[in-house]
Each structure stands twice: as structure tokens, then as C-alpha cells.
Amino acid sequence: MSGSNDLRIAVLGVGMMGADHVARITERIKGATVAVVNDYFIEKAEQIAAGIPGCRVIGDPLDAIADPDVDAVVLATPGPTHEKQLLACLEHGKPVMCEKPLTTDVATSLEIVKREAELGKKLIQVGFMRRFDHEYEQLKTLIDDGTFGQVLLAHCVHRNPAVPPSFDSSMIVKDSLVHEVDVTRFLFDEEITSVHILRPAANPGAPEGLQDPQIALFSTESGRHVDVEVFVTTGVAYEVRTEIVAEKGSAFIGLDVGLVRKFGTGAGNGRSGAGMSGGEITPSFKERFGQAYDVEIQRWVNAARTGAETGNYIDGPGAWDGYAAAAVCAAGVQSLETGERVAVDMVDRSSIPGAEPAERPIGPGA
């Protein structure tokens, strides 16, 4: 949805996620336009650009970032390229929405945090979209307003029908469990201090060598515990659920929508015993979190357009959140390999001047 004062965005990487963002910005986001696209496969970039009036293809991602007619950047490129591209965004003062991961290791993620802090601006937002899902927002409000008293623990489920052949056991931690890492930090507003990955019996239907499912146990600064079942080869559908348990009750999100029937013996259902049938199952993350992605990008665009007034160009998880996720996942991979509980190794946030949390912008859509 374009206009003369739109935020001109370069989308780097137009695979499944990047192409989805291009369509989102072009069709539904207000105040922004896709001005440049870039991809390793130039033909793909040209195909997408051809459908957007005035959109150009720039072959080098660093040239796309530096282009004077680009105001902001969406990074949907492979994780190993993020460090160099994020540093270029910081160098040119360009707000950037970076799909996870921030970078592929803890040290470079911390370096990104420090480099941004030195600028005195919040330019990097990380794409943890669940924070923008209405059910997670409801759960967060319930926790923060004290309705159920002190929250004690959480149970999470994260299931996928299948993964690519290249997916290995560590990627279950780094690419899937990372979302529950951010959800835990978002809901409880504190850091995770240790991770223990348990290895149940492997799914016979999983690719050879893939340890799936996995059970993750988190401990937080205040002593809360979170357990997560991650199962990425169910062969069924996409399922994400979270339950919090507190001193005065519990709350549960993630049930699929649709008619569910419970019936007893002789209910005319053609079965001999009691049971349950019906309901709909979400096929993939795009259907489950499509609205959350729209809200995420709209709020980022709003913040990026007004950031010059405050130095805060983001409205959501920032570079520190990306670093924290990397640190927890590194501990998770170590635990997967050793079978032991592993402490999360992070620097003290207060030791980095300028790395404090950004205040949420006030304005349309905020």
C-alpha cells in the first residue's frame, strides 16, 4: 500500500519468508513500499520485482543497504549472512527488521548489540512474531496485571509436520525451540539461566540420525520452570500451545479453531464407544501466525518512520533479545550433546551503556 511519503524498504532474501514479507508490505501494510529486492537467485528477485511498480533489483545485498533510495531493510537472508548485513545497516543508519537468528553465534550477536549501543539508537528489530499474536498478548496481559497471582511455571508444545532433509538435531534447538526461548523471556520478563535437553525415544518416522522429539527444561532468574516438547516430524500439522500455571489459576492458548464434538455410546455416531471428533488443524506457521506477522511489520514500519524524533526505530524485540536467544540456544545445543543441564552464559545487560530496553513508540498502530 504505497504513498508519496512511504518508508522505502529493501527486502533482502525473497525465499518463502522474504516473498511473504514482500506480499505483506505491498498488499496490506500502510506507509511502506518495497523499493528494492535482492536474492542470491537473481531470477527469483527479478520475478518478484516485476510485479511491483518502481521496484528495482540490486544484486549485491550490501549495495542494496547502502542505496540512497532505501530507508529501511528487511533481512530474510540465510543466518550466516546476517552479521555483515546488520553491520552495514548500522553503518548507514538504516532501521532493519531481521528475521531470526540475529547472527549464528553468541559472540557475533553480542558484538552487534555493542555496535548498536555505541550509536545511541535502536535500529535493529528481530522477528520473533509470537509477541504480536493476540493470544500471546492476552497471556502476557494476564500475567502482568496479576489476575492469577504469582506465575509458577509454564508448559509448551511446538510441533511441525515435517522438516527439510538438511535439518539436524541441533537445528531443533536453534530454529524451533528458539521461539519458546523468546516466549519465555517475553511472558516472564526475565532471563533464562539454564537449559536441560532430554532425549526421549526417537520418532521412527524421523530422518535417520535426527533426535526428534526433544524435551527442553528452562529455569529462569526467579526460579520459574518451563518445559517444552519440540516434535518436528509429527506428520500431522503445525501445533503451538502454551499454558501458564499460577498461584490462583492457569491459562492456556493455542487450541485450533473449529467444531469439536464429544459423544457417548449410542449417540448415533457409527461407533461403538464414547469419543470425540471434529475441529480443524493448522497446516503451517503461516496460517497460525499470519495476523501476527502483519501486526509485527506494521508496528515496525510505524516506528521506523518516526524514529528520527526519538532515536528509537523499533517496536518489538531488539538486538539484545536476539543475543539472549543465541546464548540460550548455545546452552541448549551443549546440553543436547552432553545430556547435562547447562548454565546460560550471558553478559550483564547493564554493563553495556545504551543496551537498555527501548521504550515502546507512541503513535498510530503502536
From Swiss-Prot:
UniProt-recorded name of the protein: Inositol 2-dehydrogenase
The organism's place on the tree of life at top rank: Bacteria
EC number of this enzyme: 1.1.1.18
Gene name per UniProt: iolG
Family the entry assigns: Belongs to the Gfo/Idh/MocA family.
Assembly mode: Homotetramer.
InterPro entries named among the record's database cross-references: Gfo-Idh-MocA_inositol_DH, Gfo/Idh/MocA-like_OxRdtase_N, GFO_IDH_MocA-like_dom, MI/DCI_dehydrogenase, NAD(P)-bd_dom_sf
Enzyme type, top EC level: oxidoreductase
Catalyzed reaction equations: myo-inositol + NAD(+) = scyllo-inosose + NADH + H(+)
Protein function: Involved in the oxidation of myo-inositol (MI) to 2-keto-myo-inositol (2KMI or 2-inosose).
